[in-house]
Curated annotation (Swiss-Prot):
GO aspect biological process, one term: positive regulation of fertilization
Principal location class: membrane
Compartments (UniProt record): Membrane
Name this polypeptide is given: LHFPL tetraspan subfamily member 2 protein
Lineage of source species: Eukaryota, Metazoa, Chordata, Craniata, Vertebrata
Amino acid sequence: MCHVIVTCRSMLWTLLSIVVAFAELVAFMSADWLIGKAKTRSGSGDEQAGMNSEPHYLGILCIRTPAMQQVSRDTLCGTYAKSFGEIASGFWQATAIFLAVGIFILCVVALVSVFTMCVQSIMRKSIFNVCGLLQGIAGLFLILGLILYPAGWGCQKAIDCGRYASPYKPGDCSLGWAFYTATGGTVLTFICAVFSAQAEIATSSDKVQEEIEEGKNLVCLL
């Protein structure tokens, strides 16, 4: 018989797992990894002279640059690489692979975590422990990706974004929110991996077993 078990710690772990996967996915697809300084627009009119454009944003896969026309101020946003081989740097290609693998694992864990309220074990293995192990592995992939990412700052696109950019030196560029989100998400991934053990303890406690023995199909312990 299926028992729905909800505890404070298991729900918190589930929510954190979903948040981490979503944050890493959004950061990966964002163009806000490197932010270049705003460049001066050149125009024929007096009003256009000396006008600063929006900053230049460069991500691992995406780019957002301000339109340089005199009239239009819309930004151009999208992926700059039509194929994997067109990614700006070999280091960024490796970063994309490691981050993609890590994010895929996190998304799978986030999906499975929703069903842990109904199913707590498979083949006598705790789902919480298995998911915690997978989150730890995903965190290692994310760390490798984040370590390799600054090594690609010497590529031409990074130099176009900001002068004096070189490996592990952003030059005139600054780091955007996507990099910090990915870094924070990586830290939170390891926290989730450790906290999964607490979720396992909470759902297999004596109080939960007592509720099940009383014939309750819905066990809610906060």
